[in-house]
């Protein structure tokens, strides 16, 4: 079984510039989910939205082509794709000739689907969209909608996940709120390098104490875990301690190595949000 410690993270890597799908390094989701109390059958739906800003290949005449790529990896896939391996894989397209962008898109979809669904009794596909240069000026930048928790002047002293900071009012009528923060920070599980993010929490149920929620978000500051795992941990802690009827947690992390990762988890089926980057991304 692939583990984070066996990946290329934190190691010197040769940059291959000829197409090589074997560079992708899938890591099973299950071990971390069991640690969080998720179990083999998650109670949430969702996906991991990736954006690749550094994708290039050669056309049949050897002329470089560029594009942005967006990926939707369903959270029911048994594996996440380790991000450095994703970067190395994308770099392997750099000096490889393809007849057109459609062939590149098809190759990306086939390879990433195989890695993400590897080991599943029934495999499916991931979503892949290429944005060519003539579409670049249509790309929007927008902030997360909702009431900002960052307006609160709270004292923060805990920098590892502290779910006991979460509380809700159970003896008052339920509410529906959308709360956001730009103060999410965690660290790479293997290298300890900082990962900076913003988070949007939408819920219906007992009103969540906002000061405690902000302190809880800040408590991830020194925590080592992958983006997807942090969002699932936030979801499970809120679900367990605050007992909402509906809950959605969506985080957008700043890019590293030309990639950003934006995990989305929700308690009820709904449309995946459009992959619109924020100013910090």
Curated annotation (Swiss-Prot):
Catalyzed reactions: 7-aminomethyl-7-carbaguanine + 2 NADP(+) = 7-cyano-7-deazaguanine + 2 NADPH + 3 H(+)
Indicate which residues the UniProt annotation says bind NADPH: 83-84, 256-257
> What are the GO MF terms of this UniProt record?
preQ1 synthase activity
The reply to whether Manganese figures as a keyword in the UniProt entry is: no
EC main class here is oxidoreductase
Q: What keywords were assigned to this record?
A: Cytoplasm, NADP, Oxidoreductase, Queuosine biosynthesis
Under the heading InterPro entries, the entry gives: GTP-CH-I_C/QueF, NADPH_dep_7-cyano-7-deazaG_red, QueF, QueF_N, QueF_type2
Query: Which pathway does the record list?
Result: tRNA modification; tRNA-queuosine biosynthesis
Recorded hits in SUPFAM superfamilies, A to Z, give: Tetrahydrobiopterin biosynthesis enzymes-like
Q: Which purpose does this protein serve, as stated in its record?
A: Catalyzes the NADPH-dependent reduction of 7-cyano-7-deazaguanine (preQ0) to 7-aminomethyl-7-deazaguanine (preQ1).
Q: How does it assemble?
A: Homodimer.
The record's comment on protein family reads: Belongs to the GTP cyclohydrolase I family. QueF type 2 subfamily.
Protein name, please?
A: NADPH-dependent 7-cyano-7-deazaguanine reductase
Per the UniProt entry, what species is this protein from, by scientific name?
A: Polaromonas naphthalenivorans (strain CJ2)
């Amino acid at each position: 079984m692939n583990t984070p410690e066996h990946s290329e993270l934190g190691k010197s890597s040769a940059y291959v510039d000829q197409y090589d799908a074997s560079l992708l390094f899938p890591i099973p989701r299950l071990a971390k989910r069991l640690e969080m109390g998720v179990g083999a059958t998650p109670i949430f739906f969702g996906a991991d939205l990736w954006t690749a800003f550094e994708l290039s290949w050669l056309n049949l005449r050897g002329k470089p082509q560029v594009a942005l790529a967006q990926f939707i990896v369903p959270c029911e896939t048994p594996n996440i794709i380790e991000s450095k391996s994703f970067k190395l894989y994308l770099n392997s397209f750099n000096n490889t000739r393809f007849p057109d962008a459609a062939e590149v898109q098809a190759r990306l979809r086939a390879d990433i689907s195989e890695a993400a669904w590897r080991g599943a009794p029934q495999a499916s596909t991931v979503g892949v969209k290429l944005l060519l240069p003539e579409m670049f000026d249509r790309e929007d930048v927008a902030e997360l909608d909702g009431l900002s928790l960052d307006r609160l002047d709270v004292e923060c002293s805990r920098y590892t996940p502290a779910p006991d900071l979460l509380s809700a009012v159970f003896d008052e009528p339920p509410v529906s709120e959308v709360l956001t923060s730009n103060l999410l920070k965690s660290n790479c599980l293997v290298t300890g390098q900082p990962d900076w993010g913003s988070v949007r929490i939408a819920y219906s149920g007992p009103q969540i104490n906002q000061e405690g929620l902000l302190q809880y978000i800040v408590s991830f500051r020194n925590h080592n875990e992958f983006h997807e795992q942090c969002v699932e941990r936030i979801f499970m802690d809120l679900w367990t301690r605050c007992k909402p009827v509906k809950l959605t947690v969506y985080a957008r992390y700043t890019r590293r190595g030309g990639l950003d990762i934006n995990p989305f988890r929700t308690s009820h089926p709904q449309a995946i949000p459009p992959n619109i980057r924020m100013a910090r991304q």
